[in-house]
């Protein structure tokens, strides 16, 4: 498929669309294990419904739960609808041996069909630790140059296939590498009813998109083969952007804020930008290797930095780019990721690479690393501003998008909370999983604040399967509810030993569910698959899927995730339901 002179490949959620990239590098370290990866299993109906019922019970009255159990029994009866749907799902799995029965459905349902803004509801951020290096590293352009140089080194390994496939655990289990295709030179494109993701060829698109004072700039920071310039030369290019952008009073209308709008609204605004004669400019922005945002603001506290990374003022961003590096005027920095085709596993690996490259102690007298893979610069193309032609209709769209974004910001609160009383090591001395312990603490906290129990989601990564992404761990259980009630309602009457016993049962339940989810045997993804093969247009229906407890049990008022990295100050994402 082509758009003017530059070719691109486009997907609507099926990882197989770009399979040619893997096949062209099948012998490379990054992709050579792909064909040997196990396929995502289809769990049995019995184990899925056992997990589902146990997790639904804490959210239901006794009468509601009996109705839910009755619907499940009817679904599971011999020769019933459940068997038919399971057979269809197994057949789909066999038909997609080169992928996964779930991947395309999940990419569409969870991401590309979602019509809300990506910022807040899809995007996630990482707050990098401050640079401990020399003063030059801590300036805005110095920090940005150091990070960008490391990112471009990582990109060379990705597009060349020389990056080894990621492995996990003591057994060094290989993980699927498919998502790496969507890290660089990729951009989500809005549509009225569903989005698409475009991949541009790295060759010929080694430029980066730099945003400064709401303006877009195409900046060349590598040679023709993608080898990055030195940090010093990259810094010079970034300083040239700052000089071109001018003082704050010269800011232009922020085209970038359109990418923060709802997807149908942004799709219509994008069509208008194309009609205004901006096709080539949009293409250069979307085809860029990544985006780098040089912000005027200087957030100090972790909460201030978190908000600035998570959404900022919405103007100096391109929220559809897979990777955006954000650097503030005081040198604080982080990453903003677009989630539709790529989970956090690849980007945390990128972050680890960048942090180790930029936090190292080996600098020369000028403050630059003594060893770096860089291309000598004989001549360099100056940064090119992308100055959009804006019709009155486009100008009105920008004003409306700004107002919508500002209202959305005002509806959100964020606070980075740090607990210093004890940590994971002390929790482990009690033979308790730190992750499960924190999940139970969250359950107790919600009940203390609201007097309610909330459906709680925690992802488990299943990248060890071909085209696997995540499974769902349901953190609320009967065991968790029993412990919370013992702590809150009966703490004066229950001895400590009994409450500790209940905590251990709750933790064991969570750990067991987590282990099953890590094997792609969670209830939610399987139930989604069964609902997808239901032929509702032919009169098929099941009370399982219309049961209010089913809806309530997957209405994630609390959405959580577990990630640890020594060089991240914080990280996060937004709520997944309006009252979450």
Language-model features, listed with the residues they occupy:
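Long, Pro/Ser/Thr-rich low-complexity/intrinsically disordered regulatory tracts in eukaryotic proteins
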Residues: 1-321, 329-331, 338, 342-580
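Conserved ATP phosphate-binding architecture of protein kinases
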Residues: 324
């Amino acid at each position: 498929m082509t758009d003017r002179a530059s070719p691109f490949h486009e997907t609507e959620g099926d990882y197989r669309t770009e399979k040619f990239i893997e096949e062209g590098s099948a012998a490379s370290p990054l992709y050579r294990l792909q064909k040997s990866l196990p396929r995502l299993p289809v769990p049995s109906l019995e184990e899925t419904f056992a997990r589902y019922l146990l997790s639904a019970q804490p959210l239901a009255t006794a009468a509601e739960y009996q109705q839910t159990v009755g619907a499940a029994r009817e679904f599971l009866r011999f020769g019933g609808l459940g068997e038919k749907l399971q057979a269809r799902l197994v057949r789909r799995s066999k038909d997609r041996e080169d992928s996964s029965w779930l991947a395309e459905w999940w990419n569409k349902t969870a991401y590309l069909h979602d019509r809300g803004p990506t910022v807040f509801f899809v995007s996630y951020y990482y707050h990098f630790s401050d640079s401990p290096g020399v003063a030059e590293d801590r300036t805005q352009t110095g920090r940005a140059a150091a990070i960008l140089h490391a990112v471009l080194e990582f990109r060379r390994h990705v597009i060349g296939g020389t990056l080894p496939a990621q492995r996990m655990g003591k057994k060094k289990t290989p993980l699927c590498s498919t998502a790496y295709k969507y890290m660089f030179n990729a951009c989500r494109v809005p549509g009225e009813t569903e989005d698409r993701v475009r991949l541009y060829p790295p060759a010929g698109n080694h430029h980066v998109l730099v945003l400064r004072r709401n303006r877009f700039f195409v900046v060349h920071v590598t040679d023709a083969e993608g080898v990055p310039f030195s940090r010093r030369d990259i810094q010079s290019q970034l300083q040239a952007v700052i000089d071109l952008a001018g003082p704050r009073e010269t800011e232009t209308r922020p085209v970038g804020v359109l990418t923060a709008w709802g997807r149908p609204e942004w799709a219509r605004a994008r069509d208008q930008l194309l009609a205004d004669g901006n096709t080539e400019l949009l293409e250069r922005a979307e085809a860029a290797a990544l985006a780098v945002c040089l912000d005027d603001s200087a957030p100090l506290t972790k909460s201030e930095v978190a908000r600035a990374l998570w959404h900022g003022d919405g103007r100096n961003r391109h929220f559809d780019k897979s990777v955006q590096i954000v650097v503030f005027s005081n040198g604080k920095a982080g990453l903003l990721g677009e989630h539709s085709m790529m989970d956090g596993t690849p980007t945390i690996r990128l972050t680890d690479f960048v942090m180790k490259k930029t936090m190292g102690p080996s600098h020369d007298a000028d403050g630059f690393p003594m060893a770096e893979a860089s291309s000598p610069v004989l001549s360099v193309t100056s940064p090119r501003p992308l100055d959009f032609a804006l019709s009155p209709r486009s100008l009105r769209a920008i004003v409306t998008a700004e107002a919508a974004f500002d209202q959305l910001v005002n509806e959100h609160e964020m606070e980075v909370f740090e607990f210093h009383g004890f940590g994971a090591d002390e929790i482990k001395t009690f033979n308790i999983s730190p992750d499960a312990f924190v999940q139970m603490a969250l359950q107790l906290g919600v009940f203390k604040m609201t007097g309610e129990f909330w459906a709680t989601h925690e992802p488990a990564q299943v990248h060890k399967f071909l085209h696997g992404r995540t499974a769902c761990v349901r953190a609320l259980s009967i065991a968790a509810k029993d412990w919370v009630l013992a702590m809150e309602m009966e703490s004066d009457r229950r001895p400590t030993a009994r409450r500790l016993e209940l905590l251990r049962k709750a933790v064991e339940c969570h750990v067991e569910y987590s282990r099953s989810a890590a094997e792609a045997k969670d209830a939610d993804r399987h139930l989604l698959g069964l609902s997808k093969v239901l032929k509702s247009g032919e009169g098929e229906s099941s009370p399982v899927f219309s049961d209010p407890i089913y809806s309530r049990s997957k209405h994630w008022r609390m959405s959580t995730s577990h990630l640890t990295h020594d060089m991240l100050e914080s990280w996060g994402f937004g709520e997944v339901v309006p009252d979450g």
